């Protein structure tokens, strides 16, 4: 079975409570976000392709909704509150600001999503937190696991 875990929801799966919160800022956009209706789109794209500068194209490889909005964050807080901020597992795409700084120093910039997850980290009680945005496999602290290509049995 494949489940789409919606942002800010608490799911009970196999007797375990799981808080899910997707979303993250794209880090590979130093060349910018291109608009297909820009009269200079082809010229800009060609220049970026020649210089191997990473970029995204709005509505093709980048969407504004990659970050949660305030309504989704509030929904997550409300759902965690309904469970006394206690779940077995947290599954997110990115991680908290403090964990992100530990992983990448100043390379990754904090944003409203990592700050929101910092709040969750400070208030929620959980056994393990799984996230994968940073394309690596490693344990961060005892409770946070950066997962990319691995499959881990949780119980």
List PLM regions with ranges:
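Glycine/small-residue-rich loop that forms an oxyanion/phosphate-binding "nest" at active or ligand-binding sites
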Residues: 1-6
């Amino acid at each position: 079975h494949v489940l789409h875990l919606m942002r800010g929801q608490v799911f009970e799966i196999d007797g375990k409570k799981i808080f899910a919160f997707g979303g993250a800022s794209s880090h590979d956009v130093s060349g910018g976000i291109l608009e297909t209706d820009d009269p200079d789109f082809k010229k800009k794209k060609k220049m970026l392709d020649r210089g191997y500068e990473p970029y995204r194209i709005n509505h093709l490889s980048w969407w504004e909704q990659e970050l949660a909005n305030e309504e989704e964050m509030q929904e997550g807080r409300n759902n965690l509150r309904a469970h006394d901020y206690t779940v077995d597992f947290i599954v997110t795409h990115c991680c908290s600001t403090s964990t992100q700084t530990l992983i990448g120093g100043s390379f990754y910039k904090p944003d409203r999503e990592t700050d929101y997850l910092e709040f969750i980290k400070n208030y929620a009680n959980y056994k393990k937190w799984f996230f994968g945005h940073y394309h690596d496999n490693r344990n961060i602290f005892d409770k946070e696991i950066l997962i990319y290509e691995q499959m881990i049995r949780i119980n």
